[in-house]
């Protein structure tokens, strides 16, 4: 196959983007002052360090939600064709559910479901 036209179009697109970015940098106004380099937080001047690390406690809930949400994505198609799969399909989905229940029990035991 001849990809010459595709290469020409791709190079033209890359060149066009490069020209637009260079032109934007060349003609954009620049005014450097002290206020431009300050952190802006809701209009309130910051005191101390503007960035500080803090713990987020809800990420475990989000991960557990995603885990069980993905479970439903696998369960719905299985429920539609459950009769066609036979005993092998039943055993595989039961294994899948047992692993998920064990994961939930582990998370519960470790206190991941408690808001601290």
Swiss-Prot record:
Membrane topology, as annotated: Multi-pass membrane protein
Pfam families cross-referenced by the UniProt entry: Oxidored_q4 (PF00507)
The reaction(s) this protein catalyses: a quinone + NADH + 5 H(+)(in) = a quinol + NAD(+) + 4 H(+)(out)
Complex and partners: NDH-1 is composed of 14 different subunits. Subunits NuoA, H, J, K, L, M, N constitute the membrane sector of the complex.
Presence of keyword Transcription: no
Transmembrane segments annotated in the record for this chain: 3-23, 61-81, 88-108
Name this protein carries in UniProt: NADH-quinone oxidoreductase subunit A
Gene designation per UniProt: nuoA
EC number: 7.1.1.-
Function: NDH-1 shuttles electrons from NADH, via FMN and iron-sulfur (Fe-S) centers, to quinones in the respiratory chain. The immediate electron acceptor for the enzyme in this species is believed to be a menaquinone. Couples the redox reaction to proton translocation (for every two electrons transferred, four hydrogen ions are translocated across the cytoplasmic membrane), and thus conserves the redox energy in a proton gradient.
A GO term, aspect molecular function: NADH dehydrogenase (ubiquinone) activity
